[in-house]
Amino acid sequence: MTRPAPPAVSAPPPLLEVESAWLEDPPRSKARFEKARTESSSFDPSAKPRLVEWLDPGGAAPAAVAGWDEAIEAGAPFRASGPLRIEYTLDEALTEKVWRIMRKGRVDRGQVIVIDPRTGRLLAYVSADEEGLPANRAYPSASIVKVLTAAAMLEVDPDQSDSTCVYRGNKYRVNRRRLDRPSSGRESDLEAALATSNNQCFSQWAVHVLGEEKLRSTLRRFGWLNPPAPGHEAGRAEAVETRLDLGRLGSGLDGVRVTPLHVAALTSVLTGGRWIEPWWVDRVVDSHGRSLALPERADSREVISSEIADRLRTMLVSTTKRGTAKSAFRTRRGRPLVPGIEIAGKTGNLSGRDPSGRYEWFMGVAPAKNPTIGVVVLQLQGHLWWAKSSELAANVFKATFCEGKRCDAELASRFTGDLPGFEGPMLISDLDALDALESEPPPAAPAP
């Protein structure tokens, strides 16, 4: 009597799928950070440097899918067994350093993001007041928008961007009369205008060189009119009705609102010319150790050429060397705060509403020639404040690139994991890839 053939089994079951809503709220608050770091050290020593949270999906468990197990017949359905373990890309040690910097700066309402701009992977995502200043909401972008205006200038007419702007009086004040180039006054080129955040120059360029269509298309290409990642608001740009509206839009005086995560994605564009969706979840595992498939991230896309990205970073170094952030990146004795590391950055500040206060930004990447770290800081300041956003960012860069009195670009690998042979934090997905690589048979020896 012939025995029936066993069910064909050639591969493990497909990964269960995670609902994106479960992953839209990383542990940004101090309370959730402390809980996540405790849980990260309780289950897997190899993942200790990364933050971990547990999720009980309850009735919202992933849909059943067809799978197999030796204990059940092939094709029988199974479900993810909760609670689920969410393993973040957020680095415990770096996040603790960021919290210390914010505490020393007495930050009441503010956010800090540290990102690997080459991949979009978040290394720290901190929010001092999730109720008063939610990290997923859009706020006035202030002069950060000048980076996009400068990119548009370099695209439209590289020679024009090398020419000078002429302005009179206070470079930060713009009115209808100051939208046109005066017959005489002080001069500034694009690099100097970026470094000093010259509103008159950027307003003139917006009106006479770029126009509304080019500015709005640039905002759209940079991803500023869409959500930067799941769970975050889309950016928005107000309608332009007058020349003054256009000038204020291009200089950042009004009209554009974005989340800090939009600005974090900008660091990726500055690094390689490509928009990359920021992400903060490495993997999700059920109670049986089965990985769940994560929602697919948006495809990266080219926004500007790598040549323009390189040129922008070179210009933005002037901000930290002799521009609006010069004092933040120097010690009281005038020495570089992060010696040997050039930092490209941009400041921004603007009074706004909803909520009311002074919005102060800093965005930067380092090392400027080959960025591995991006930092974004946003504060909402009241009548009293203790530290500028550029000062907070400078200390975050110092914590990333310095150890004791030694500062070196390679020290960032403590958090990004780039340094060969470095036995530090690795993502579980990195370990899986390493296991797969080590399991491959060695190549055959060449024939004599």
Predicted feature descriptions by range:
Residues 135-144, 228-289, 297:
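Active-site-proximal helix/loop microenvironment
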Residues 98-102, 120, 138-163, 193, ...:
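Active-site SXXK
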Residues 102-130:
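A short, well-structured edge-of-sheet supersecondary motif
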Residues 86-87, 108, 130-148, 161-166, ...:
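Short active-site loop at a secondary-structure junction
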Residues 1-111, 295-298, 401, 406-437:
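Extracytoplasmic/periplasmic proteins that interact with beta-lactams or build/remodel peptidoglycan
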Residues 90, 109-118, 163-174, 181-236, ...:
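Active-site-adjacent helix/loop patches that line small-molecule binding or acyl-intermediate pockets
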Residues 333-368:
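Short, Gly/Ser/Thr-enriched beta-strand-loop segments that form substrate-interacting elements
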Residues 163-194, 230-233, 265-333, 383, ...:
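Conserved active-site-proximal loop/helix segments of enzymes involved in bacterial cell-wall
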